[in-house]
Amino acid sequence: MKKVLIIEDDSFLQGLEASKLERSGYKVITASNGGEAIKKINEPDIDIILLDLILPDFNGFEVLAKIRQLDHLKKIPVIVFSNLSEEKDIDKSKELGATDFLVKSNFTLDELIKHMNTIVK
């Protein structure tokens, strides 16, 4: 079973994502803010990270930079899943090591999961 860390401050959306991913065969752990995410990224056997950029304390860019600083997480795929859609946000995410950048309003959860499945085969 693949393990996903969902970093999302919107509790309703986090719940939807977690429920859908669990039904799709993922083991889910969640973080609601950057500080919580920084603690949870050290959990063993995380296969993929789903990261929102708009968080209440650290922003998603800071969390992504921290993830990529840790040797054991450098190769773990990080999908930025955010409502931010400006080119500068996409570029900055890629520069910091995001595997992909998906705009929430452009993808259903089913499409997101299909995309995740191709990444973590």
Go through each PLM region and give its residues.
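The feature encodes the CheY-like receiver
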Residues: Q14, P56, K74, E86
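Short amphipathic alpha-helix used as the core "switch/output" element in two-component signaling
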Residues: F61-K74
